Amino acid sequence: MYGPKDHGWIEVVAGPMYSGKTEELIRRIRRAEIAKQKVQVFKPEIDNRYSKQDVVSHAGDKIQSVPVKSSKEILEKLLDDTDVIGIDEAQFFDDFLVEIVSKIANNNRRVICAGLDMDFKGEPFGPMPKLMAIAEFVDKIQAVCMVCNNPATRTQRLINGKPAKKSDPVVLIGAQESYEARCRKCHRVPR
């Protein structure tokens, strides 16, 4: 994941909830800070589960971030001397994020995006599939299925302890009260 200083690139960390995507983003950003690189982290304003300002993992790790309403706002708030850009919860941004991330990487910067690759229905989520396609480095990580303990690649939404229906809205900000990590076999989406 390291290249010449005169080249930019895109890294994507994808997987279901509770797989450690945000922890990995924070780890990579902290390593860049140790290397004396200038970093900026962005997150969608709607992600206010644990903090309005910080990016916070389910495990409690956190790092300062800039909440933005849209992907275009990332360009507006990006400082000229930033070397490494982190973007958490990338799935919540519009498809314009793909163009913005490409533009930033084309300007010799490292961009790290973390997000859910699939929604609770098991379908590609937001700009993540396109980001994964254009990225130089993609890490698809797994959680542990909360039913059978096998590797989990999906996010199960629960409503009153039961699987959400296919007709339910895609975006619902929540944590353990609303979601579980599930494997392919244990994941359910009733019609």
From Swiss-Prot:
User: Which Pfam families did the record assign?
Assistant: TK
Question: Which residues of this UniProt protein bind ATP?
Answer: G15, P16, M17, Y18, S19, G20, K21, T22, D88, E89, A90, Q91
Q: Which UniProt keywords apply?
A: ATP-binding, Cytoplasm, DNA synthesis, Kinase, Metal-binding, Nucleotide-binding, Transferase, Zinc
Q: Enumerate the catalysed reactions.
A: thymidine + ATP = dTMP + ADP + H(+)
Annotated active site residues, numbered on this chain, are E89
BP-aspect Gene Ontology terms: DNA biosynthetic process; thymidine metabolic process
Q: What is its EC number?
A: 2.7.1.21
Kindly list the positions annotated as binding Zn(2+). Answer: C145, C148, C183, C186
Transmembrane residue ranges: none
For molecular function, the Gene Ontology terms on record are: ATP binding; thymidine kinase activity; zinc ion binding
One cellular component (GO) term of this entry: cytosol
Q: Where in the cell is it found?
A: Cytoplasm
The record's annotation in InterPro entries points to:
P-loop_NTPase (IPR027417), Thymidine_kinase (IPR001267), Thymidine_kinase_CS (IPR020633)
Family recorded in the similarity comment: Belongs to the thymidine kinase family.
Please describe the quaternary structure of this protein: Homotetramer.
Name of the protein: Thymidine kinase
The gene it comes from is tdk
